[in-house]
Amino acid sequence: MKSSEIRQKFLQFFQSKGHTIVPSASLVPGNDPTLLFTNSGMVQFKDVFTGKETRSYTRATSSQRSVRAGGKHNDLENVGYTARHHTFFEMLGNFSFGDYFKRDAIQYAWELLTQVYKLPAEKLWVTVYQEDDQAYDIWATEVGVPRERIIRIGDNKGSRYASDNFWQMADTGPCGPCSEIFYDHGPDVWGGPPGSPEEDGDRYIEIWNLVFMQFERDAAGNMTPLPKPCVDTGMGLERIAAVLQGVHSNYEIDLFQNLIRAAARETGVTNLEDNSLKVIADHIRACAFLIVDGVIPSNEGRGYVLRRIVRRALRHGYKLGQTKPFFYKLVPDLVAEMGQAYPELTQAAERVAQVLKQEEERFGETLEHGMKILDGALAGVPAGGQLDGTTLFTLYDTYGFPVDLTADICRERNVEVDMAGFDAAMARQRDQARAAGKFKMAEGLSYEGADTRFEGYEKLELDGVKVAALYVDGTQVERVQAGQHAVVVLDATPFYAESGGQVGDTGLLESGGARFAVADTLKIQAGVFGHHGVLESGSLAVGDTLLARVDAVRRARTVRNHSATHLMHKALRQVLGAHVQQRGSLVDPDKTRFDFAHDAPLSAEQIAQVEAIVNAEVLANQPTQARVMAYDDAVKGGAMALFGEKYGDTVRVLDIGFSRELCGGTHVSRTGDIGLFKIVAEGGVAAGVRRVEAITGDNALAWVQNQNALLLRAAGMLRTTPADLPERLAQVQEQLRTLEKDLEQARGKLAASAGNDLAAKAAEVKGVKVLAASLGDIDPKALRGMVDNLKDRLKSAVVLLASAGGDGKISLVGGVTADLTGRVKAGDLVGFVAGQVGGKGGGRPDMAMGGGNDAQALPAAVASVQGWVDERL
């Protein structure tokens, strides 16, 4: 039975039991900052299990794409060396949200395994939690599993409820016993049943885990029965495929064998058992699907995990002798295997291959050099020894070797790595970076009052606000005097505090004779706004009542740029593709600067398309709408959650024209308020990240007017109209090319004429003609032509010509005819003269060039040539 058929039969079976088939969630958890990657089927249902969210169904089934690499769940170092470790795997699961419980879950599992997949019942063993008599009885009396094949597992991890058969989401919250199903590979394979001393052997392999969430655990460890118990099950597709296909290693199943053959094809390897092929076959799955879900290789977070996996695959390709990009060529093979089950892979295949190829080319430049450094270092380390932390860090910092990649190589050679030394070197670098950094917000502002009430969405002026706290030089004070720089915390404010890329507001705080100029607004902690500025007059004390007034003109320019950013983000996705995701932004009164995931520069046509789309939305003058709702409802409604951002349970959804994003910033009331949108710059800021700068409103109008003025000025200089300027410029360019050609011909004639005059000045040294001369300001190219001409005229000669320009720079050209290069070399001659005029030179035996900058020394240097030649003849 093929892997694709196993997956399909699983989903269809549970669909027939009233389950809704739910598509795989992204590998990037949508709303769980505690997880680096989605690593199980229950992740997308976490809030349903905890009661924070409800769905339209109470039964679900899915095939969840999962990754375990980096963070707590990290299988990377074992991949390729064991039968069942993977970075990427598929978790088949069925779930009940307060619907059925143990009886149905157990019976469904048994029916699928024995009647649909037709596994021999006598090959199946099960485990239950020691105290879970209900599950034990269902297995024994209702399903009919012999009691000798039902094993109770107690608290085998050192504390109460710490057991392989007791699951808990965290220290507190939903938890409960679980029942695991094992397959017996038979007595020919070493190992014992679960719970025995030999349980780590490969004879009994876990294929399915049924989790029964029936308790709520509090901080004191007390267990309270849940009013609606739930079921969460997980069965690895790769493991069940190995069982159903009669193989012992996951890498022997059809899906992996096809990828291994593809890897062998691209690396030229014939031994399909090579572990490096297994590594490559595993890693292409993880890398491709991470890119599909918006992760790109980088030096931090999820992007760095992806980079580590890619580079580990490339190192194994290098080990197999492949030094050219090959990894990206496996994408079509992966699409053939998994594209039908996951259409998103097929849709993004070209993009995936492009990202992988670029990463291969980037790392390929340093891989060979890094391997030479590592090989040299390991040559001096005996088996069982240790590679020093300094070398580890050099490979990481200079050659881009992730430390686990170096450790992988060392392990193959039975060498340990000095992680303590590496960590120390890394810490030193971080300390240096911190020392060099400058932080905008003073650290250590302690505030224990209520959060600031923000009213700046509707108001730019707010009277009657109270001073809640004052800070001078980081210290909390009761009063501020005129002339002092301070931070003011208010109970309420119309000032927006810098967040989400939008700069903070400026303006005034006034009361009687007190006037505080706000230069910036920043959060001193979550929910607390600090107004930074200087008290221009009067005094200010805690408890004072003020009028807070935002600089309305500056705010208006800022919100125009912010709203335009949303429209531009949407337009970029339309023009370039759905892979475009925000990587950073800065919105201030002057511009919007937007960083996004994309690999290639934008063409002029693409920029024009984006501008046209945004300005069409501006002209439509649609009203904007902001709503507060649950995060999951927002995402279901099509709101874009920005990559890498963390959101609370409740979010603000902003509709601007055709854009819908989660955003807490300030915006225009109607799209027409943006006025005009213009992109003024585009470039790269990092690997796979582009930056666009754009302006709006009066800034955009001023830019257009300035460009028009430049156009009119240029047209006037060429005595034409702006409309005819391109044609006129083409004419001027053609005229320039003709003049340059004529000039070149004139220079050639001049050189020939000068050569005729110089030839007569050649001296004879031991029967050899020697000519050395300084000619004033002559182009180096013309100088070389003159040397060639003189060599032809003199037939057998040594020639050195020099020119000194008005800027003091000296050009030297030396030539030696072929019959003399055995005794006199042009490169040596030019080097000798250049050394006397403060420069360097060199070249071939028959022709060489050089230069210098000491014009005063040039006459003596030229005069020394005859003596130098005489010494060599």
Curated annotation (Swiss-Prot):
Cofactor: Zn(2+)
Protein name, as recorded: Alanine--tRNA ligase
Keywords: Aminoacyl-tRNA synthetase, ATP-binding, Cytoplasm, Ligase, Metal-binding, Nucleotide-binding, Protein biosynthesis, RNA-binding, tRNA-binding, Zinc
Domain text: Consists of three domains; the N-terminal catalytic domain, the editing domain and the C-terminal C-Ala domain. The editing domain removes incorrectly charged amino acids, while the C-Ala domain, along with tRNA(Ala), serves as a bridge to cooperatively bring together the editing and aminoacylation centers thus stimulating deacylation of misacylated tRNAs.
Keyword Secreted tagged: no
PROSITE patterns: AA_TRNA_LIGASE_II_ALA (PS50860)
EC number: 6.1.1.7
Cofactor stoichiometry and binding remark: Binds 1 zinc ion per subunit.
MF-aspect GO terms: alanine-tRNA ligase activity; aminoacyl-tRNA deacylase activity; ATP binding; tRNA binding; zinc ion binding
Classification via InterPro entries: aa-tRNA-synth_II/BPL/LPL, Ala-tRNA-lgiase_IIc, Ala-tRNA-ligase_IIc_anticod-bd, Ala-tRNA-synth_IIc_core, Ala-tRNA-synth_IIc_N, Ala-tRNA_ligase, Ala_tRNA_ligase_euk/bac, DHHA1_dom
CC terms in the record's Gene Ontology section: cytosol
GO biological process: alanyl-tRNA aminoacylation; negative regulation of DNA-templated transcription
UniProt keyword annotation of Ion transport present: no
Species in which this protein is naturally found: Bordetella petrii (strain ATCC BAA-461 / DSM 12804 / CCUG 43448)
HAMAP family, sorted: Ala_tRNA_synth_B (MF_00036_B)
Binding-site list for Zn(2+): 562, 566, 663, 667
Matching Pfam families: DHHA1, tRNA-synt_2c, tRNA_SAD
Catalysis performed (reactions): tRNA(Ala) + L-alanine + ATP = L-alanyl-tRNA(Ala) + AMP + diphosphate
Recorded superkingdom: Bacteria
Role, per record: Catalyzes the attachment of alanine to tRNA(Ala) in a two-step reaction: alanine is first activated by ATP to form Ala-AMP and then transferred to the acceptor end of tRNA(Ala). Also edits incorrectly charged Ser-tRNA(Ala) and Gly-tRNA(Ala) via its editing domain.
Gene symbol of the encoding locus: alaS
Family under the similarity heading: Belongs to the class-II aminoacyl-tRNA synthetase family.
Lineage per the UniProt record: Bacteria, Pseudomonadati, Pseudomonadota, Betaproteobacteria, Burkholderiales
SMART domains attached to this UniProt entry: tRNA_SAD (SM00863)
Subcellular location: Cytoplasm
